[in-house]
Amino acid sequence: MIEPLASIFRTNNYDIKPVLATLFKSEHFYDVLNQGCLIKSPVDKVISCLREFGVVFPDSVSQYSDAYAMWNYIRNWLASMNQDPGDPPDVSGWPAYYQAPQFHEIWINSDTLPKRNQFTDTMITNGYTRNGKKIVINAVGFTQTLSNPADPNALIDDALAILYRVPLSVTAKQTIKEQILLTNQTQDYYWTNAWNGYIANPSDQASFNTVNTRLKSLYQYLMNLSEYQLS
């Protein structure tokens, strides 16, 4: 990959854009051997969580004060996980990028792992509120973007395809489905009926609470598993 990309770089008068376009469209970039092999940095974990779930921030132009305050809230979380953007520990950057033999494993220790989980727990439950504006994961809204939310099997598969870089076993997915979406039942219709009931009458608070509670539990559980720490 190095030599062909270098050739593209020279051919395009040292414009980096064609190089990146070629790399991001290459088979090598999507090689399964490159997936799930690194622990996410705090920035990777936090920003990917916000983007994958489509968390909405206040407008940075019309509501810049609230927007900047919420960005700073996120920055504080990153700093607590030992990666404060723009403030590396020294000129070498963060040790996880160069310190052998641990490298990326440095990101997780007895202090940072609980904080990584606390962040996702916070975002899927109460979020963060300032001046009446909130950043929080909309569990129902995210689920509505999936291909077939009424089918608990498809729902879990679609969610995992977005959130995970490594596959879960069939047994693990079945257990998650039965314990969370089916509330310890065994038939899929326990979830299907609940979801369809909400879709038929989205203004009904009881129907919303039923699906929202289960979905929050599902996503919180998935984000607390070790597989979610991998990129």
Task: Write out the residue ranges for each language-model feature.
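Flexible, low-complexity segments enriched for small/polar residues
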Residues: M1-N12, P18-S231
